[in-house]
C-alpha cells in the first residue's frame, strides 16, 4: 500500500502543471555568460595612454582657443547708464563696464578707451511718452565680417527657477482660446487672470517678464549711413513651432501686467499680438539654464561692418537693479564653433597638460622603482591567510 501511494504521488508530480519560476531564461545574455575581455592595465599600456591623450587634447584645445580668439566682440554693460551718463554730452564709459575684442592688426591709432555714452529723452510715438535712451558711441578698428549679431546679456536672472520655468500654458501658446477657468487650472500661476477675470494673454511669469529694452540699428558717424539689423530669423525653428496665431478675440483677454505700458488701453483689433511672429518673445520663452545668459536680439547676415565710429540707441525699459542684476549689449561676429567662449579651449589644454605631467611622473616612478607584475607580496588576502595558518593548525 505505501508503495502504491508513492507511485501515485510521483505520477501526479510528473504529470501536473509546471511550477512558475522567476528565473531568467537560460541564455548567454540573461545568464551573463557572454564572452568578455578585460584589459590588463600594465605600465606599458597606461603610461603611453597619458601621453597620447596629452598629444590629442593639446592641439584640440589650441584649435578651440584660436576659433574663439578670432571672434570680434564688443560688450557694454549699460546697467548704470541712467545714473552715470549725462544728458548734456558724451562721457567715457568706465573701463570695467565694457570689453572690446577687435582685430587690431594693421590698425593705426586705435584708442581702446573710445567707448562713450550719453542719455537722451526721445518721444516714443507708440507709447506717446518721453523715454530715456542710452546712446552708446564706439569705434570699430577693423572690418567685421557678416553675419553680425546683437545680443542682450543678463546676469543674476534665474530663468531656471522651478516656479518661473513652469509658469506657462502651452495650449494657449498654440492658439487655443482657453477660458478663465481653464487658465486657472493650468500652470500659469500666479499670473492667470486679471481683476476682471479675463485671462492674461500670454499668461504666466515668463511672458510677463519679457525683456523689452529696444535696440536701434547702427549709425556710422563718418557719413551718417545706417547699418540695418533685422529681428527676423532670431528664433530656433523648434521654438517657432511652439507658437501659433491665437483664436482669442481682443475683448476676451488682457495684456500681462508688465505689458500694460505697451498696451495701456488693452488689446484691440489693430494691436492684438500674434505670437507666431513675435520672435523676440519666442527667444525669451526658451528659458536659460544659468543665471547669466545671452539671447539674440537682432542680426545682419549679409553686410560687413567697416571701420569707423558708430552709435546705437537703447531704449531703457527693463529693470534689473531690483534683483541685483546687470544688462549688457553684445555686438559680435562668430566662428565655425559659434561665439567667443575660451573656456572649452582652456579646459582641453589644461587636461592635456595634466595628462603629460602625470605621464611623466608615473614614467619616472616606473623606471626608478619598478614593480614586478603580479607580485604576490602585494596580495593582502595572501598575507592574512599565512598569518592565520599557525593558529588554524593548533585547532583540535
From Swiss-Prot:
Please give, as recorded in its UniProt entry, the membrane topology of this protein: Multi-pass membrane protein
The lineage, from the top, is:
Eukaryota, Fungi, Dikarya, Ascomycota, Taphrinomycotina
Q: Where is this region: Disordered?
A: 1-30
Q: Which cysteines are joined by disulfide bonds?
A: 81-134, 188-203
Q: What is this protein called?
A: Phospholipid-transporting ATPase accessory subunit mug89
Superkingdom to which the source organism belongs: Eukaryota
- The record's gene field reads mug89
Which InterPro entries does the UniProt entry name for this protein? CDC50/LEM3_fam
The species this protein was found in: Schizosaccharomyces pombe (strain 972 / ATCC 24843) (Fission yeast)
Recorded family membership: Belongs to the CDC50/LEM3 family.
Amino acid at each position: 500500500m505505501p508503495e502504491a501511494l508513492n507511485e501515485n504521488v510521483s505520477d501526479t508530480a510528473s504529470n501536473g502543471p509546471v511550477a512558475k519560476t522567476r528565473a531568467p531564461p537560460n541564455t548567454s545574455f540573461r545568464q551573463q555568460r557572454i564572452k568578455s575581455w578585460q584589459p590588463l592595465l600594465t605600465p606599458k599600456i597606461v603610461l603611453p595612454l597619458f601621453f597620447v591623450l596629452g598629444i590629442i587634447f593639446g592641439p584640440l584645445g589650441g584649435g578651440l582657443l584660436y576659433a574663439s580668439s578670432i571672434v570680434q566682440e564688443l560688450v557694454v554693460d549699460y546697467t548704470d547708464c541712467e545714473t552715470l551718463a549725462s544728458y548734456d554730452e558724451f562721457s567715457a564709459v568706465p573701463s570695467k563696464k565694457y570689453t572690446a575684442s577687435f582685430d587690431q592688426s594693421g590698425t593705426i591709432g586705435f584708442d581702446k578707451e573710445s567707448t562713450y555714452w550719453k542719455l537722451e529723452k526721445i518721444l516714443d510715438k507708440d507709447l506717446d511718452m518721453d523715454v530715456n535712451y542710452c546712446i552708446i558711441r564706439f569705434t570699430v578698428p577693423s572690418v567685421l565680417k557678416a553675419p553680425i549679431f546683437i545680443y542682450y546679456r543678463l546676469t543674476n536672472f534665474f530663468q531656471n527657477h522651478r516656479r518661473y520655468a513652469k509658469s506657462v500654458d502651452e495650449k494657449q501658446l498654440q492658439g487655443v482660446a482657453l477660458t478663465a477657468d481653464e487658465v486657472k487650472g493650468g500652470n500659469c500661476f500666479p499670473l492667470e487672470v486679471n481683476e476682471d477675470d479675463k485671462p492674461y494673454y500670454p499668461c504666466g511669469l515668463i511672458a510677463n517678464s519679457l525683456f523689452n529694452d529696444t535696440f536701434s540699428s547702427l549709425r556710422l558717424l563718418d557719413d551718417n549711413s545706417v547699418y540695418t539689423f533685422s529681428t527676423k530669423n532670431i528664433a530656433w525653428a523648434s521654438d517657432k513651432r511652439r507658437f501659433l496665431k491665437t483664436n482669442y478675440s481682443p475683448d476676451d483677454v488682457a495684456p500681462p501686467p508688465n505689458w500694460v505700458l505697451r498696451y495701456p488701453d488693452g488689446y484691440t483689433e489693430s494691436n492684438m499680438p500674434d505670437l507666431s511672429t513675435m520672435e523676440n518673445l519666442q527667444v525669451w520663452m526658451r528659458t536659460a539654464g544659468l543665471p547669466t545668459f545671452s539671447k539674440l536680439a537682432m542680426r545682419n547676415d549679409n553686410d560687413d561692418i567697416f571701420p569707423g565710429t558708430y552709435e546705437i540707441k537703447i531704449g531703457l525699459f527693463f529693470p534689473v537693479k531690483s534683483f541685483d542684476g546687470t544688462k549688457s549689449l553684445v555686438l559680435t561676429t562668430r566662428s565655425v564653433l559659434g561665439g567667443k567662449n575660451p573656456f572649452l579651449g582652456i579646459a582641453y589644454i589644461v587636461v592635456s597638460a595634466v595628462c603629460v605631467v602625470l605621464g611623466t611622473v608615473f614614467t619616472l616612478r616606473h623606471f626608478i622603482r619598478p614593480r614586478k607584475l603580479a607580485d604576490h607580496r602585494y596580495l593582502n588576502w595572501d598575507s592574512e591567510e599565512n598569518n592565520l595558518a599557525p593558529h588554524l593548525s593548533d585547532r583540535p
